[in-house]
Curated annotation (Swiss-Prot):
Name of the protein in its database record: Superinfection exclusion protein
Role, per record: In the absence of gp17, P22 is sensitive to a superinfection exclusion system of the fel-2 prophage.
Annotated organism of origin: Salmonella phage P22
Source organism phylogeny: Viruses, Duplodnaviria, Heunggongvirae, Uroviricota, Caudoviricetes
Pfam families linked to this entry: GP17
InterPro entries in the cross-refs: Gp17
Length: 103
């Protein structure tokens, strides 16, 4: 599965995009980028900020009609787990830790 993180350091800028190899790597990247924005603010590098970020996956199953119906420009969609139980990658990783601990 192809994954990428999008990060907007100052809304409404265009997003910075970086491909990642796993959900865990994506969460680390999102956290690092958010921490960097906070660091810049805390150290008076920038006077304020309003950031946003997320994890996306490439959905090859989407047809051209799906793209049109969903008003998408490409096949990158917001990440969700295979079971469709999670759409927040942090919650998903936490659930995996809990399963491992319980076993």
């Amino acid at each position: 599965m192809k994954l990428r993180v999008w990060h907007i350091p100052q809304v409404p800028m265009k997003p910075f995009i970086v491909e990642v190899g796993s959900v865990e790597e994506g969460v680390r990247m999102m956290d690092a980028l958010a921490d960097y924005d906070a660091f810049q603010y805390d150290n008076n590098i920038k006077p304020d900020y309003c950031n946003a970020n997320g994890l996306q996956m490439f959905d090859e199953s989407l047809t051209d009609q799906d793209l049109e119906d969903m008003e998408l420009d490409d096949r990158w969609i917001d990440w969700y787990s295979e079971c469709q139980c999670y759409d927040d990658p942090r919650e998903y990783l936490e659930s995996l830790k809990e399963e491992t601990t319980a076993a």
